[in-house]
Amino acid sequence: MPKYPLVLDCIAPHYARRMTDATDARLAEQYEAYPYPQRDPRDEAKRLIIGSPSHLREIDFWVFGAARPRSRPLRALIAGGGTGDGTVMLAQHLARAGRPGDVTYLDRSAAALGIARARVEARGLSNVAFHQASLLDLPRLGLGPFDYVDCCGVLHHLPDPAGGLAALLSVLAPG
């Protein structure tokens, strides 16, 4: 039985139509050819890092109710990390705040991963681990558990969105 059966029961009807393997393959080719969002790592020296949902203050307040000790290392997963916006922002916030923790980037696109890695390197960040894989493979990768998971704009692209949510929940730390 899934850890969060109610969540899965609520979303499963919305994802009853699954994409075909051919559609999934075309989508993978698209993101390999056109990594999203378009970013140039040479711009990192002048690029602002703003946004949501991976803003450290928002995570502290909205996810942990401002009750999580800041001295406790934060393990975060950015699933479907694309060209690295969420990864760069959260890793930079942790580093600037002198907070312990690490960010795990996961995306199936080698092209997007290459851009994300170059952006992280351009900023001199050392608190990011990169993995090229589908988030559907998370339970087999042995990467968790994570205190926080960011998966924005990804599930609807999967051949099995409910399975994707189940995979994310499987690596989320208790509590």
Predicted regions, residues:
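A short glycine-rich, Lys/Arg-flanked "PGG" loop and its adjoining helix->strand segment in the class I
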Residues: A162-P174
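A short acidic, Gly/Pro-enriched loop at the edge of an enzyme's catalytic core
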Residues: P139-V149
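A short SAM/SAH-binding and catalytic strip from SAM-dependent methyltransferases
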Residues: D147-D160
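N-terminal, positively charged/glycine-rich alpha-helical extensions of SAM-dependent methyltransferases
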Residues: M1-G51
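Conserved alpha-helix/loop element of class I SAM-dependent methyltransferases that forms part
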Residues: A33, Q38-L74, M89, H93
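Class I SAM-dependent methyltransferase SAM/SAH-binding core
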Residues: R75-L138
